[in-house]
Amino acid sequence: IVVSDEIHSDFTWGENKHLMFASLSDDFADISITCTAPSKTFNLAGLQVSNIFIPNETLRFKFKKAVDAAGYSQVNVMGLEACQAAYEYGEEWLTQLKEYLKDNIAFVREFIQTRLPKLTMIEPEGTYLLWIDFRALGLTEAQRQDLIENKANLWLDSGAMFGPDGEGFE
């Protein structure tokens, strides 16, 4: 079973397109649980609503049974209505949000290039989260965290939390 968190799927940049895991083949769809939500796209996190797509009927039945047993069978009606309204009427919101985010990404890119030239921003293909490469500074994880938290007064997520390939990134 593959649980695919596709909460950032509404955010792609340039010519990039998001392909849902389940759309890649019938075999993939048969083993997939796809999770999306309007929380990132439409700023609705407080309404605690998400979408879970399970094409496989047997898997969907097992999931529903587990959800019911855990006591989560009730739907947040306000969240459900907001989710539906957001996807039905929110295209202009999303268009404006993406323009705003593009400007933010451009600002970070220029700031790093002009003021922090040893750092590199990885150009995002999707999402509004940015990967900043700190490896050229030659710092240990502890030194980098000290620099970021105590000298720059920033709170960033260490790339190491995503595994060895994320080490040196924030």
Label every model-predicted segment.
Residues 80, 84, 100-109, 121-134, ...:
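Conserved glycine-rich beta-strand-loop-beta hairpin in the small C-terminal domain of fold type I
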